[in-house]
Curated annotation (Swiss-Prot):
Entry similarity comment: Belongs to the helicase family. PriA subfamily.
Quaternary organization: Component of the replication restart primosome.
Any Pfam family hit: PriA_3primeBD
GO biological process: DNA recombination; DNA replication; DNA replication initiation; DNA replication, synthesis of primer; double-strand break repair
Binding-site residues, Zn(2+) 1: C368, C371, C408, C411
Function as written in the Swiss-Prot or TrEMBL entry: Initiates the restart of stalled replication forks, which reloads the replicative helicase on sites other than the origin of replication. Recognizes and binds to abandoned replication forks and remodels them to uncover a helicase loading site. Promotes assembly of the primosome at these replication forks.
Protein name: Probable replication restart protein PriA
GO molecular function: 3'-5' DNA helicase activity; ATP binding; DNA binding; hydrolase activity; zinc ion binding
Keywords noted in UniProt: ATP-binding, DNA replication, DNA-binding, Metal-binding, Nucleotide-binding, Primosome, Zinc
Cofactors that this protein relies on: Zn(2+)
Protein's organism: Mycobacterium tuberculosis (strain ATCC 25618 / H37Rv)
Lineage, top ranks: Bacteria, Bacillati, Actinomycetota, Actinomycetes, Mycobacteriales
Nucleotide-binding found in the keyword field: yes
Cofactor, free-text remark: Binds 2 zinc ions per subunit.
Gene name of the record: priA
Amino acid sequence: MLSVPHLDRDFDYLVPAEHSDDAQPGVRVRVRFHGRLVDGFVLERRSDSDHHGKLGWLDRVVSPEPVLTTEIRRLVDAVAARYAGTRQDVLRLAVPARHARVEREITTAPGRPVVAPVDPSGWAAYGRGRQFLAALADSRAARAVWQALPGELWADRFAEAAAQTVRAGRTVLAIVPDQRDLDTLWQAATALVDEHSVVALSAGLGPEARYRRWLAALRGSARLVIGTRSAVFAPLSELGLVMVWADADDSLAEPRAPYPHAREVAMLRAHQARCAALIGGYARTAEAHALVRSGWAHDVVAPRPEVRARSPRVVALDDSGYDDARDPAARTARLPSIALRAARSALQSGAPVLVQVPRRGYIPSLACGRCRAIARCRSCTGPLSLQGAGSPGAVCRWCGRVDPTLRCVRCGSDVVRAVVVGARRTAEELGRAFPGTAVITSAGDTLVPQLDAGPALVVATPGAEPRAPGGYGAALLLDSWALLGRQDLRAAEDALWRWMTAAALVRPRGAGGVVTVVAESSIPTVQSLIRWDPVGHAEAELAARTEVGLPPSVHIAALDGPAGTVTALLEAARLPDPDRLQADLLGPVDLPPGVRRPAGIPADAPVIRMLLRVCREQGLELAASLRRGIGVLSARQTRQTRSLVRVQIDPLHIG
């Protein structure tokens, strides 16, 4: 495997007789390339070669284990083509590092897994729910986008779909955003499927444990693989179902080249394997809805009466019944009276209250108190934050430097104000507002998975909300402007997903559950939350993006790097070329906020972003042109001068 793009192709080698039996397709080998030994995989064995020069000899077979199966090789090729990457980069994600001792362990022959009977009543609440389970039992390639009801035990539904597929003799792959979701799904899955037939793959595993579980999938002893984003490449044969939960979560986007999204890889794999697919969530992304609109997948959505019965009552500022004369601070206060009243009512009934804040920490962002300029680090221009009430100074969130004497670089003032209030500061404020009430914080490294019964105030960041026995009595969604006000393509979609994930933990309206969102009720995203209509929101979002030419209605390639290198790549790729590829060239623009600079570029070198936009039908052609251009640049540059452009196809954050 060669890391330079212009050498991303197959090479022919002669196989010595002593290695002939072991050198089978898919095994790891060592070969000599330009005088040095490099790792590689055997792709196929042939009796002839198209190479007209002298062939070298294979040096040795590292292991006779065929780790690169035909199915995974096809997937690797397709992902590299889709995301304008190299196969070496994709293989790094797909095949873990070898652990020799684990390979030598004897694996018992896989038997028929024990699967408990599946109760279809959970899926019966949804239109086409029973039909989807029946299709899995018949090993049909049913594809669905499932809208989970509020309060739904999503892991139980996923486990039922997996068990139905395993019972039919097929394997299942389930992808979740993080370890917390993985643990939840593991408990639900092992309640229905024999634990010895289920493996979990995640980044937190050590190399030995990860390779052992990966081999269990390769050798056929694992029939159900659940894992985080990289598990989407798990080497399962006879694949019958691919599932993805909460595809709106940024954790499913791979931060390493070629930056594939687990949802896209999973759907690509389902297409190649001609198997069933399921995307589930409390909210819905425009990408998932596009699959429904195209006819590739079916809607699995509960009828409106069922949604109203299961959802909490959602109120916004204009729904409080207070006019501006009675509550002048309702539109400006961080905790208006409507939110405080909902919290007090729930606490008095003995129920816990969930308070969702967008950011962890104490005060994660500061600004000048006079001119409102954002306070930034003098060393790296990163955002400054306060770590606590007694903090000796502001700390940079990027480089960690401490600035003990804050002074605005624009107006010279030494007065600062909080731009965003974090979870710990919010917990302090609530402790003063509700004396004698337990305040629990779940954010960052301090995660609380489950609450005990009884009243409590729980301050949590999105994704860190603990489950409460019987559900929360109320939820307060604070600082809505921090989510909705972002200059980002997915700001509204992301806000609704975070809100619905929290609101789904609240009791139904019939049991007194109420959700208070501190935002104007006239905002379309807030209206979607009030009506609990994620499908309608996704429909509107998709229509709006289609109208202005944004993903998923089109494909966009983001090229990040120094201006000269970006221009050189465009010239090498011959883009744009009206005669060959109808591509719109947009930019240059600055990198979006929060997007890190490409690796290897000096800190003082300016970085730009150029965007290339094509219709969906020309996405593969755009990626192929960029791959050719990257290869040309790679061949021209030396190791000392190499500064390739970072290329991302359909990045989450466009700018």
